[in-house]
Structure formats: structure tokens, C-alpha cells
């Protein structure tokens, strides 16, 4: 990640690059990307009320593509006249009305980058598992509380338990814990890994050899834990799937790779 202000120093005059901004409004944070053509060049995350230094210098000067799972936050950014994506904009089949636009974009980005059929695991505030077949048809999926949400909920709702933070979780915990914080980490992490292993193995039976990719804020640590916990599962990690999905819409659903 560059330390300069997002969007600084990137060429605007090359017609092939055509810069644009992507904004994914998630359940707890704003996810930004500075894109040139169909490639995310810089990505960063802010809270819902970002400081001016965190905003891209090109905001309002180049096209802004926006997707959101928080309607009231969408209204904040209408002043920049964004192209607001909905499920109707995506070339995917069998989506139900309440299906999350973030899941759909990640699925599209996964399929066009790694090939359909594909399974995408998004490790965010909510952890989602979503599968599409070779015809870009939604097979189905699941939603569970993410790692951070589980840790926070145990600390908030149970007086005898400490509230633990994700930054304390730096390595795969011991399964058989001998203190309360370690027991919480063990239960949360191995519970999530067990669920993921079950879904991924079932997906392999349904679609042998199909792509399986992890993304999201907790995606990198989940990917590392899963490799250690279930080394026989072939799962990629890609932090840009949602923005690759946006790029596909921006460029008319052309293959990314």
C-alpha cells in the first residue's frame, strides 16, 4: 500500500487507462479502489466518516461506481453522482431479491478471473459462502457471523468473558485451551474452520476442480488458518474480487484475465 494520498500520482492522459473509482459500502466500513481500465491499482479502507486525507483526490473528477449493503450510507455519496450498482446490473442468474450486492460482485469477479463454476468465501463482518455454476447461476450459499463479530458478541453479551480483538489473533490457536481468552479463540476459529471445511468439501463433490477463493477483511488470516488446518483443500486468496466484479460491469462483462 502506498503511503501517499489515495489516487495521487496516477496517469490520467493515457486513453487506455481511463481512471475511475470504486466504492463498496460494507456493513461496518467503506472499501475504496482506484482503478485504471479493468485493474484496481490502489485499495484502502475507511470508516463511515472518512477524514479528507483518506478520500481519493479524484473524487468528483472521474467516474464513481458504488455498491452498498447499507442504504442510508448510499445517500451520503449521491452528491458525487455515482453509478449505483444493483443486482439488475449483474450478468448472474437465479439471484433472489435480498441477495447481497457484495456477494454478487465477489462472485462475478471470482468467476471471470478464476473461471465458472466458482465458490467465494467473503470473510467480513458477516462471513458468506457463495457458489455459482458454469452458467453463472447461483447455486446457493450460507451466512455466518464473522470472526470479529463472534469475538465481540461473546465479550459484549457475557459478563464473565473478556472482549477480544482480531489483532490479538495472529496465529492458529491451540485447540485445547487452558485459559479463557485462548478458549474463546479456539472455539471461534475452529468453529469457523470446521464450517468452511464442510462447505468446501461439499462444493468439491458438486463441482470437482472448480475454483474456490477467499476474500474480505479477514480473508487473508482465514486463508492462512485454512491452509494449516486443511492443507488438502486448494483455496486461493484474492483481496480484489468485489472490485474485479465492478470492473467487469464497467467494461461490459469482459473477462478480467
UniProtKB/Swiss-Prot annotation:
Keywords: ATP-binding, Coenzyme A biosynthesis, Cytoplasm, Kinase, Metal-binding, Nucleotide-binding, Potassium, Transferase. Its cofactor is NH4(+); K(+). Pathway: Cofactor biosynthesis; coenzyme A biosynthesis; CoA from (R)-pantothenate: step 1/5. K(+) binds at residue 122. Its main location: cytoplasm. It is an enzyme of class 2 (transferase). Substrate binds at residues 96, 100-103, 180. The keyword Transport does not apply. One of its GO terms (molecular function) is metal ion binding. The keyword tRNA-binding does not apply. InterPro entries: ATPase_NBD, Type_III_PanK. GO terms for cellular component: cytoplasm. One of its GO terms (biological process) is coenzyme A biosynthetic process. A monovalent cation. Ammonium or potassium. The active site is at residue 102. Homodimer. Catalyzes the phosphorylation of pantothenate (Pan), the first step in CoA biosynthesis. This is Type III pantothenate kinase. The gene is coaX.
